[in-house]
């Protein structure tokens, strides 16, 4: 159970749930599962797939290449090192763009993936391999 989902954690439930968009991520081993339950949020309104309203994100990329580079850096330089320290779950913000946010991995109309799919696959495989080493 995740009692606080990123808010003021009072030590209840099975999960220590962290939301982190702007600060260095520092995970320490805990008695509960540590989950990064909100992170990412890199905005890029893909041309031709924008939502009907003006939208925002937690940082804006100017192109697919920049979005992919920033996403890769976040995964490999911020998330990956924390796996050895006990990070056990990830929830990226967010799966797809919505009416007022363009920080999804998929477009608002869900017809296109925004970062480069080959890069996403390679990084996800690296994260999975690193995680598997922590549970062996």
Q: Residue spans of the language-model regions?
A:
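Substrate-binding/catalytic cleft of secreted carbohydrate-active enzymes
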Residues: 1-111
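Catalytic cores of secreted or luminal carbohydrate-active enzymes
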Residues: 107-136
């Amino acid at each position: 159970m995740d009692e606080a989902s990123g808010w003021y954690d009072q030590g209840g439930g099975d999960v220590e749930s962290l939301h982190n968009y702007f600060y260095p991520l520092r995970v320490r081993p805990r008695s509960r599962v540590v989950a990064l339950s909100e992170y990412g949020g890199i905005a890029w309104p893909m041309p031709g797939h924008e939502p009907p309203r003006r939208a925002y994100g937690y940082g804006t990329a100017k192109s697919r290449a920049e979005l992919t580079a920033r996403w890769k850096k976040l995964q490999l330089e911020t998330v990956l090192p924390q796996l050895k320290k006990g990070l056990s779950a990830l929830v990226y913000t967010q799966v797809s763009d919505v009416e007022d946010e363009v920080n999804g991995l998929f477009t608002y109309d869900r017809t296109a993936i925004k970062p480069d799919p080959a890069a996403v696959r390679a990084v996800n495989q690296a994260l999975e391999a690193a995680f598997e080493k922590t549970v062996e």
